[in-house]
């Protein structure tokens, strides 16, 4: 049975696999749509996927093991929080640079007190914009730390995990992220797959 990989396929694939079905997760990015179709909808897409599966040419995605998805998704959430943190730091840097000409490092911004903000930006509206961003930054930092603490309790110290950390710049969290995103490398029979 083939299922198209969409943003919400987990529940369907898990339920069907739990019921004993053998699943193929169709990779829509790798599927060429049939040019002769005059219109497409879910029914015609399903028929097309069934034909590809029947002929043995359905491009497939990897069904990541159900038990490992929560920690991978938690690491993805961490990455998203870090992106938000970076966006907030850049926003504060830009406000300060535009209004004072001062270039402050990310670490300096993260450690600023409200008094320092008001001393640097005497305009109340500008100070409020920076203060708001700093409040969000502190919240994001706290949540990133919470997620990292949880991830550290779930680390699996495999030889590959240890090897990854020998690369400069790769610590425990990034090594775990790489391992969780790549999954089991044995699923690739040859280099380039």
Regions found by a protein language model. Give the residues of each.
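Glycine-rich, often acidic, oxyanion-interacting loops/wings at catalytic, nucleic-acid
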Residues: 75-163
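Short glycine-rich phosphate-binding loop at a beta-alpha junction
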Residues: 1-6
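Catalytic palm subdomain of template-directed nucleic-acid polymerases
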Residues: 176-190
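Short alpha-helix plus adjacent loop in nuclease-associated cores
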Residues: 17, 24-76, 80, 115-119
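Histidine-centered phosphotransfer motif of kinases
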Residues: 167
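Short, well-ordered alpha-helical microsegments
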Residues: 9-13
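Generic alpha-helical structural context detector
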Residues: 50-51, 94-97, 180, 193
């Amino acid at each position: 049975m083939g299922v198209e990989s969409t943003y919400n396929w987990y529940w369907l694939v898990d339920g069907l696999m739990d019921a004993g079905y053998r699943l193929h997760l169709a990779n829509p990015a790798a599927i060429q749509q049939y040019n002769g179709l005059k219109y497409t909808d879910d029914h015609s897409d399903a028929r097309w996927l069934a034909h590809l599966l029947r002929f043995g040419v359905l491009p497939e995605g990897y069904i990541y093991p159900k038990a490992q998805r929560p920690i991978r998704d938690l690491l993805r959430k961490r990455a998203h929080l870090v992106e938000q943190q970076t966006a907030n730091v850049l926003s504060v840097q830009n406000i300060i640079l535009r209004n004072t000409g001062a270039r402050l490092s990310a670490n300096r911004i993260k450690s600023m007190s409200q008094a320092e903000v008001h001393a640097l930006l005497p305009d109340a509206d500008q100070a409020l914009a920076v203060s708001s961003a700093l409040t969000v930054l502190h919240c994001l930092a706290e949540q990133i730390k919470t997620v990292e603490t949880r991830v550290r309790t779930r680390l699996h110290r495999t030889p590959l995990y240890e090897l990854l950390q020998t690369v400069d710049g790769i610590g425990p969290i990034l090594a775990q992220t790489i391992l969780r995103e790549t999954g089991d490398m044995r699923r690739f029979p040859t280099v380039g797959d």
